């Protein structure tokens, strides 16, 4: 069965989700809603400064987007309730505007005829959040779910392996995060986050993140044991998690690496990667995994106190897991 998917919001994640869908035979994008017109949408899809030119034919016919010969409905509705997803038989909507992050707002897609909704960000209410490979088996048929954040998708698989094998007493996470669309090119007003309004290309900017605390929702036994912060840095894509934890059961750094490597080849294959080479951030660009553990970057103070490093393409890795979650909730 091919899953029919609509995208609401054709920004960075919306477009990378679209690109990722082209590599799958179980998912078809049948509709896109954004305030962009179809011609500009085609241009934004065709050319990408981070991921390169789109591999395929992109054109516009009669106000619709035609990609590799397949017609995709284009709409420009501000209110999701008016989207008439039923007219194109949409199974799942990818809600990637960043605006509709709660059950009551995302439910407008259901009212418009979609069967299910995946929110591409942490939910603002108790809408369940899922990280593939970590808690996806707890899905109970909910119509509206969240794919959490890109950082939570990097951190949670790593935390799961550590907690399962050695136990986590407590931990602090820092994500060194690439620039995102919410930042300013030059200093500008940012009433809620003064530092966040400073020029993205000129500064390393300390910021808040709920990614570590969110792991407590994904792995309940870690609730209250993890918190974290972010540094926004002037790179276009690829971020890295620095996780420092105190372990319940002692383990050498090699034992920890061995456990992560085994998980990357076993139950977390396709989600968690393992690298034992001298890589840098650009080497991860385009990697579909959500977490790539760097065995050469971590350090151990003693057998109970360790710092681990894991990379992630915060666009590609996350967007690929959106599709994996879609496939999971439509089984």
From Swiss-Prot:
Compartments, record wording: Cytoplasm
Residues annotated as binding D-glyceraldehyde 3-phosphate: 149-151, 180, 209-210, 232
Enzyme class: oxidoreductase
Protein origin, superkingdom: Eukaryota
Pathway per the UniProt entry: Carbohydrate degradation; glycolysis; pyruvate from D-glyceraldehyde 3-phosphate: step 1/5
Gene Ontology MF terms in the entry: glyceraldehyde-3-phosphate dehydrogenase (NAD+) (phosphorylating) activity; NAD binding; NADP binding
GO biological process, one term: glucose metabolic process
Record's GO cellular component terms: cytoplasm; cytosol
Main localization of the protein described in the UniProt heading: cytoplasm
Reactions catalysed according to its record: D-glyceraldehyde 3-phosphate + phosphate + NAD(+) = (2R)-3-phospho-glyceroyl phosphate + NADH + H(+)
Annotated residues for binding of NAD(+): 12-13, 34, 78, 314
UniProtKB keywords: Cytoplasm, Glycolysis, NAD, Oxidoreductase
Pfam family, one: Gp_dh_N
Site (described: Activates thiol group during catalysis): 177
SUPFAM superfamilies the record matches: Glyceraldehyde-3-phosphate dehydrogenase-like, C-terminal domain, NAD(P)-binding Rossmann-fold domains
Active-site residues from the entry: 150
Family: Belongs to the glyceraldehyde-3-phosphate dehydrogenase family.
Protein name stated in the entry: Glyceraldehyde-3-phosphate dehydrogenase, cytosolic
Organism of provenance: Trypanosoma brucei brucei
């Amino acid at each position: 069965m091919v899953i029919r998917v609509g995208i609401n919001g054709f920004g960075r994640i919306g477009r990378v989700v679209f690109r990722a869908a082209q590599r799958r035979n179980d998912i078809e994008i049948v509709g896109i809603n954004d305030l962009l017109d179809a011609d500009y949408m085609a241009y934004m899809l065709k050319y990408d400064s981070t991921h390169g030119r789109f591999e395929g034919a992109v054109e516009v016919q009669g106000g619709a987007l035609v990609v590799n010969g397949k017609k995709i409905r284009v709409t420009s509705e501000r209110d999701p309730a008016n989207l008439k997803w039923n007219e194109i038989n949409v199974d799942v909507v990818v809600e990637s505007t960043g605006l509709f992050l709660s059950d009551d707002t995302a439910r407008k897609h259901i009212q418009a005829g979609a069967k299910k909704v995946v929110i591409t960000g942490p939910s603002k209410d108790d809408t369940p959040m899922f990280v593939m490979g970590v808690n996806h088996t707890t899905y109970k048929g909910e119509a509206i779910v969240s794919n959490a954040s890109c950082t939570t998708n990097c951190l949670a698989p790593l935390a799961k392996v550590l907690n399962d094998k050695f136990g986590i007493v407590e931990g602090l996470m820092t994500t060194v995060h690439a620039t995102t669309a919410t930042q300013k090119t030059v200093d500008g007003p940012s009433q809620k986050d003064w530092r966040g309004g400073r020029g993205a290309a000129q500064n390393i900017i300390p910021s808040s993140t709920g990614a570590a605390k969110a792991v407590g929702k994904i792995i309940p036994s870690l609730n209250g044991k993890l918190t974290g912060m972010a540094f926004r840095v002037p790179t276009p894509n690829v971020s890295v998690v620095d996780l420092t934890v105190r372990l319940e059961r002692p383990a050498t750094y090699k034992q920890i690496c061995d456990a992560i490597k085994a998980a990357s080849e076993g139950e977390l294959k396709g989600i968690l990667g393992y690298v034992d080479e001298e890589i840098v951030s650009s080497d991860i660009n385009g990697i579909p995994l959500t977490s790539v553990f760097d065995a050469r970057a971590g350090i151990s103070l003693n057998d109970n106190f360790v710092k681990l490093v894991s990379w992630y393409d915060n666009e590609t890795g996350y967007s690929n897991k959106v599709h994996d979650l879609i496939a999971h909730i439509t089984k």
